[in-house]
Structure formats: structure tokens, C-alpha cells
């Protein structure tokens, strides 16, 4: 994503809400320094990092007031994220849309393993399309869910 595109998306969002929001930033993007600068300048309150080592940017973002949550696909990545100082973890199973980890672990298998390994806030992602699935993630240790693909058909998804 180009920095100008990111600014445009953030400003569109700010125009319709004053609620807290988060931006997902894959750490392998080119122009990372420029994208991070946009997040700081636009005062993004929550940054979800993924696809890279969270150690690279976590302290920098937290020192500037951002809450940092890292997306992981395994217990070992969850532990590395906590060691890097993130505020929370998204445990993303193989059912998730988009880019997944190399492990082919389902969300419902991954969640209790990660929960036993970390005490930080845990968000479930991947294959959550119903209230029942959301409830199941809570029973397995998640405090929240991240839902994406389920909303693709919504009018708001065209932004």
C-alpha cells in the first residue's frame, strides 16, 4: 500500500467516526518507514502488525502512543510477539482469508494452545462467521474476535 492510499483510508474512516480504530500493517511492505510515519501523524490508536518480526517496530509505535497487536499463526510466534513487547495477540487459524502462516492449524486448535502460553489479551481470527463460533472462541480463551471475510458482501466493504 502506498502511503498516500493509507492516509486516504484513515481520513475517510475518521470522517465517519470518532471511535477508536486499528490499522493492519504487514511488516514486509515496502516503504515501511513512510507507512509508520503516516500511522503516527494520523494518530492511529491501534496498530495490528503481521507478516514479519514485531520487534522491529513495537517499541517505536508504543513510545508514540499506539497499542500494538501482532497477528500470529503458532505458539512460537505468539511467544516471540510477547517477547517483543506487543500489547496483545491475534491467533489466526488457517481458515482466515488473506495471507496465512505456514502452519495449517485451525483457529479452534490454535486458540487454547496460545492461551496456555501467554497471558496477554488474545483475539481469535479465522473462520468466525456466526455467534456460535464467536462463543466457542471465548470458551477456548479468546477475549475478542477479528472478523473479516464475513463482511465482504456488506455495503461498507466497498470503501
Q: What is the predicted role of each segment?
A:
Residues 1-3, 90-104, 128-159:
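Glycine-rich phosphate-binding active-site loops on the catalytic face of alpha/beta enzymes
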Residues 1-117:
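Active-site entrance/lid segments in N-terminal catalytic domains of soluble metabolic enzymes
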Residues 48, 68-69, 125-128, 154:
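Short N-terminal micro-motifs specific to bacterial/archaeal maturation
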Residues 78-81, 124, 142:
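Small-residue (primarily alanine) positions within well-ordered alpha-helices
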Residues 107-136:
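Loop-centered beta-sheet repeat module
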Amino acid at each position: 500500500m502506498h502511503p498516500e492510499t493509507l492516509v486516504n483510508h484513515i481520513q475517510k474512516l475518521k470522517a465517519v467516526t470518532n471511535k477508536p480504530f486499528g490499522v493492519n500493517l504487514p511488516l514486509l511492505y515496502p516503504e515501511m518507514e513512510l507507512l509508520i510515519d503516516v500511522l503516527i501523524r494520523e494518530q492511529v490508536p491501534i496498530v495490528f502488525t503481521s507478516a514479519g518480526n514485531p520487534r522491529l517496530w513495537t517499541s517505536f509505535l508504543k513510545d508514540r502512543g499506539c497499542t500494538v497487536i501482532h497477528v500470529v499463526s503458532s505458539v512460537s510466534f505468539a511467544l516471540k510477539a510477547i517477547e517483543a513487547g506487543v500489547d496483545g495477540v491475534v491467533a489466526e487459524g488457517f481458515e482466515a482469508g488473506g495471507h496465512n502462516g505456514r502452519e495449517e492449524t485451525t483457529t479452534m486448535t490454535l486458540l487454547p494452545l496460545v492461551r496456555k502460553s501467554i497471558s496477554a489479551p488474545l483475539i481469535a481470527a479465522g473462520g468466525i462467521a456466526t455467534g456460535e463460533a464467536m462463543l466457542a472462541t471465548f470458551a477456548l480463551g479468546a477475549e475478542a474476535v477479528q472478523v473479516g471475510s464475513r463482511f465482504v458482501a456488506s455495503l461498507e466493504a466497498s470503501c
